[in-house]
Amino acid sequence: MATLKIETGAVATVTLNRPEVRNAFNDEVIAELTAAFTQLGQDSQVRAIVLAAEGPAFCAGADLNWMRRMADYTHAENLADAAQLAGMLYTIYTCPKPTVARIQGDVYAGGMGLVAACDMAVSVNTANYCLSEVKLGLYPATISPYVIRAMGARAAHRYFLTAERFDAAEALRIGLVHAVVTPDQLDDKVAEMTPALVNASPNAVTECKALLHDVAGKDINAALIARTVDGIASIRASDEGKEGVQSFLQKRKPNWLA
C-alpha cells in the first residue's frame, strides 16, 4: 500500500507513512486504512493491531490538497467523501482484533478520530492534541462519536468549542490516552501491553469488544440485561469458553496458547 507500511504477525503494525505531510489523510489513505483493518481483522494469525506513524507527527488530520478539492465539492460529493471517512473510523472501531494507537507525535483534527477509534492509546509526553476544526469554519462531526466516547462529553464541550491545544498529560487526564511515556520508552510500553492481548482467548477478546460497544453508555434495562445474559451463556458454551475453564481447572495452558 502506497501510504501505509504493514507488518503482519501475532501483533500486526499499520504505520501511516506520509511524514512529509505530517501523515495527513486523503481519500487514498482512507481507502488503504479501511482495507488494512478489514484484512487484518479477518486474519486468524493476527491477535492485535498497533496503529503507528512515521515522522514527527502522528496525524495532522486532512491533507491540504484534499481540503482544496473538498472546497469545490457539491453537497452530494461531500456526502460521499464524508461517508468514506466515517466508514474507515467505524472499521477501526469495530475491528474484531484489539487495537493500540502508538502516538509518537502531534495529533490534530481528524487524527483525533484515529486515536479515539482504537481500543487503547499510548502517547509520548511531547505530543500535543487539538480539535482544530472550528478555527476553519468546520466542526468535528465524523469523528465525534469516537472522540466523545473516549474523552467524555464534558471535556468534549471544552475542546470541540475552543479548539485549544492540550498536552499529553491532559489527554491522559481526560481519558483520551491510557499511558504517557518519554519517547525512548514508547516502544517498550506498547510491547508491555500487547502480550496480554495475544495471550487471551481470541474469541473472548472479539466478543468482549462487541460487548463493550453494546453496553457502554446504554441504559440498564430489560433489553440490555437480556443481551448480557445471552452473551455469557453463549460464550460459556463456546469451544474456547469450555477449553478455557477446563484448562484452568486442570492447571494447563489453553489450546490457543499451545
Residue ranges and their predicted role:
Residues V14, R18, E32-L33, L51, ...:
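Terminal peptide-recognition signature
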Residues M1-E54, G87-Y90, D187:
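Conserved CoA-thioester-binding segment of acyl-CoA-metabolizing enzymes
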Residues Y90-N203, E243, R252:
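Crotonase-fold acyl-CoA enzyme core
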Residues M1-A12, S44, A163-A169, D184, ...:
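C-terminal alpha-helix plus adjacent terminal tail
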Residues I30, G61-L64, L85, S144, ...:
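A general structural signal for well-ordered alpha-helical segments in protein cores
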Residues A53-T91, V107, D219:
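Glycine- (often His-adjacent) and acidic-residue-rich active-site loop
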Residues P19-R22, P56, G61-L64, D106, ...:
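A short, glycine- and basic residue-enriched loop/turn
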